[in-house]
């Protein structure tokens, strides 16, 4: 892992800050994070985000695992939001028939753990906030930047030739 090697090479964030897009609390849980303090990560969720819903989720997770050191992470929060949206789509469709639930998903809204309300778009990507967090010595992140609101999920990059003209509308 890149963060471990940064520590091994004594590369500090003050020398060359690194932004990771796939390193979160779970990945940092097994390594010494003190040499990594100040490096950055970008996610839609960090365990350290201080909202009542997030505190409740973390407490339930730690109780379920019977391990106060187990961390939460962005993929877990995404599943919480996605499952809530699925439940609402089942209610709207009046059935668990997958085709009918898929048709019911666009426009469904559900609270996320960071304090906002996410929405399922017609392309089956959801709106989420974006955060940049700075690694702390305890393996958590301090949020140093966030989007003003929720960012719509895009299925294709407008910057990649061959995908810029594609449209994702699954329904």
Identify the residue ranges that each predicted region occupies.
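Extracytosolic ligand-binding ectodomains
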Residues: 1-171
């Amino acid at each position: 892992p890149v963060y471990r090697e940064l520590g091994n090479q004594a590369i500090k964030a003050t020398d060359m800050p690194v932004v990771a897009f796939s390193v979160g609390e779970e990945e940092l849980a097994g390594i010494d994070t003190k040499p990594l303090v100040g490096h950055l990560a970008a996610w839609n969720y960090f365990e350290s985000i201080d909202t009542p819903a997030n505190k409740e989720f973390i407490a339930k997770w730690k109780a379920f695992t019977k391990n106060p050191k187990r961390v939460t992470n962005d993929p877990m929060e995404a599943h919480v939001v996605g499952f809530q949206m699925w439940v609402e789509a089942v209610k709207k469709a009046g059935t668990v028939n997958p085709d009918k639930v898929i048709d019911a998903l666009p426009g469904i809204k559900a609270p996320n753990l960071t304090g906002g309300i996410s929405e399922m778009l017609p392309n089956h990507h959801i709106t989420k906030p974006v955060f940049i967090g700075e690694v702390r010595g305890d393996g958590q992140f301090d949020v140093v930047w966030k989007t003003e609101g929720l960012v719509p999920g895009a299925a294709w990059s407008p910057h990649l030739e061959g995908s810029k003209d594609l449209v994702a509308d699954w329904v």
